[in-house]
C-alpha cells in the first residue's frame, strides 16, 4: 500500500523475488514525496515535496537497480549566506569547503575527513536499523563520538567562527529537532559528509523521475499499480500472502487496529510526530539575485544567519510557536536544469519549519529571509503557490500534521522506529509489515525502508 519511493521499493524487491505484486495508491498519481507538477504557471515544474537527494545517490538499493536517471550535481552542494555578504560553500572537495571557513577550516577538515573515509563502513548502519549490531563498530564509534552530541555542543566545541557554527546549525536543523537535543548533530554530520560523497544531486526533470523509474522497473517485473484506490481497512484488501504498508503508524492503527494486539497498537498510538513545514514554490522572471554571487552555484541554500538565530527558529517550531525569522531551506534547480522553467525564467522551492498542524501563513516571513540575502527577490516573483501543514498532509497522508520525516527524530524514536522489535518493519501479524519513513533508516528518498521491509518479509514468508 502506497506508491511513494518506499512502497515502490518494497514492491520492486518482492517482484525481483518472483512474487506477484500489486501496489494500491490513494492519490491519482504515484510518487508520494517524489512528485513534480506545475504548481504556479504553465511550464514551471516544481517538486511537490522532496527536491534534493543525497540519500538517493548513495542508496545501495537504488544503485543495484541501475535506474535510468540523469543526475545533476551542482558545483556547490550547499551554500549558507551570512549577513556580511559572504557565504559558506560546501563543495565536493573537503579542502575547498574548508577554505571557505577561514579559521575554522582545519576544524572542519578534522571533523569531516575521517567520516568521509569511513562512509563505506558507516553506510550499512546509517542506512538501516540503528538498534541492530553494527558491522563496523570502530567506524561507528568514531561517528558516535560527535554524532551523539547536540548540534550546539558539537558546534561550540569544534568551531570558533560564526560561519562554522552556522554551517553545522543549518545542516543539523534538517532533523527538525531543537539544536540542544542529544544526537541532533548526527543529522548534520551525515548530510555534510554526503555532500562530499554524493554531492547533493537531483534528477533532471524533477523528483517525479525517481518514482517513474521505480514504477517502470516494477512493471517490467510483472507488477501492477492502481492509483485512486484508497484503502480504509485491511479487510477491504484482496486475499494476499503479504501486505506491506507505506503508511504512518497512525494510519496503520486505522487500517488494522481491530486485528493488532493491544500492546503493539498502543505503541503505535504513542508515536510522536515532529514539527511540520510551510512550503512556498515560486515562478521567477530571472535567477535569485544573491548578494554573495557564489550562492548561485549551489543547488541548496540555507537561510538562517547565525547559529543562535537558527536555534531560536527550530526551538520555536518544536514548542508550538512561529519564528519571526524562520530557518528557510531553499532549492534553485532551474539554474542547472533547463526543464524546470521556460527559457530565461526560473523556479525556487522553499520551506520552513512550523508547529505540527499549523495553519499560519509563513510566506511573508520566508520572503523576508530570502530578500535579506538576495535584495530584489520579491521583484522577480511572477507567481507563488503555498502549502500549509494541512495541505501537505492532504497530498500525502504519511506527512501527519505536515511532518515530512515520518515522526519526531528523537533518540528514542530513532531506536524504536516505530516500535522496539528485533525486526522493526514487522508487526505481531506475520503477514503484515510497515515500510514507511516511520521505519529505519527514516526520512529521505532512498527506498531503504521499503527494500529492507520487503527483504524481512521474504525471509519470514
Predicted regions and their residues:
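Hydrophobic anchor at the start of a short beta-strand
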Residues: 19-21, 243, 379
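A conserved FAD-binding loop/helix module that cradles the flavin
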Residues: 50, 435-458
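A glycine-rich dinucleotide-binding beta-alpha-beta segment and adjacent secondary-structure elements
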Residues: 161-178, 325-329, 376-440
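Mid-domain catalytic core of redox enzymes
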Residues: 223, 227-341
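N-terminal glycine-rich phosphate/pyrophosphate-binding loop and immediately adjacent elements
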Residues: 1-121, 408
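Rossmann-like flavin
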Residues: 83-182
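Conserved FAD/dinucleotide-binding core of flavoprotein oxidoreductases
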Residues: 96-99, 250-254, 283, 342-369
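Helical element adjacent to the flavin cofactor pocket in flavoenzyme catalytic cores
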Residues: 189-232
